[in-house]
Amino acid sequence: MELLYTPTALKRLKTIGAKDIPKVKRKIQSIQQNPQLGIPLQGILKGKRKLVAWPLRVIYSFNSDTQQVIIETVDYRGSVYKK
């Protein structure tokens, strides 16, 4: 699968603490290998999935037709669902 990042995701990744970066990278690699791994979201985020890299959430979508995984954002639980 091709991995793409939104501008928001790239911006958020730059603000994550150094101790959380390895966890997030591992989760993103696992998403790339198996995009259906995450939990489907509801409401305004319907069509997207989340994967927890505690204490962060990786919000992403994937298109099986184009074989693309799009990392939408990475943020802490209290903030990620407000965007």
Predicted regions located by residue number:
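Enriched for short, Lys/Arg-rich terminal
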Residues: 2-7, 11-22, 53-56, 61-83
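Generic N-terminal leader/processing signal
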Residues: 10, 25, 46-48
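Short, well-structured alpha-helical segments
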Residues: 21, 25-29
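A short, surface-exposed loop/turn module that caps and links secondary-structure elements
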Residues: 29-52
